[in-house]
Amino acid sequence: MTIIDSIGGATAPSYSVLLEGPESTVCAEAPIAAHDSTAYQSEAELEDELIAQLVEQGYEYADITDEAALIANLRARIERLNGFAFTDPDWERFFRTHVAAETDGIVEKTRRIQQAPVIDFTLDDGTIRNVMLLDRDHIYRNSLQVLNQYATSAGAHDNRYDVTILVNGLPLVHIELKRRGVELRQAFDQIERYQRESFWSGTGLFEYV
């Protein structure tokens, strides 16, 4: 797969366009190779290999299978990043108003991460805290985790996600794996289907993807 910058004006051979945006285009570069049984990998094997590589690079594997565990992990990671512990009422209010507000969608959540990852939050005791969702100045303080096969049944349809990267507990990256011989476009279609059917479900944390 090649990402071709559409602004640069460079010409390229005729490729099959998968996705096209205002600043970049994703194309399929190489034709599907002839099947080689000795090199065949199932999607499960690809998934295991990817996770093993990420763990070797310092990612922590997170055994998270439901939203309650996802939220509990998010709280722990944000508390560790900021060096203090929320009381339960403070966390509930922070989560519901600044992380997973019912009125927020993909645009608002993307803007929060991209433009305002530090939130001024007043605790119940009157103390004002600058709560970071992401530390841009000291990137190695951020927590990186990987989880797989997260299942959701609260959306329009039941879905199970291949691999998710958590940054400080927030699901920011989704990876959909396809075995050799399957068109790459199918992975993009599947992610788009998740956006329609289930990323918004529950508290909508997967809308941060």
Predicted regions, residues:
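An alpha-helical interface "stripe"
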Residues: 2-209
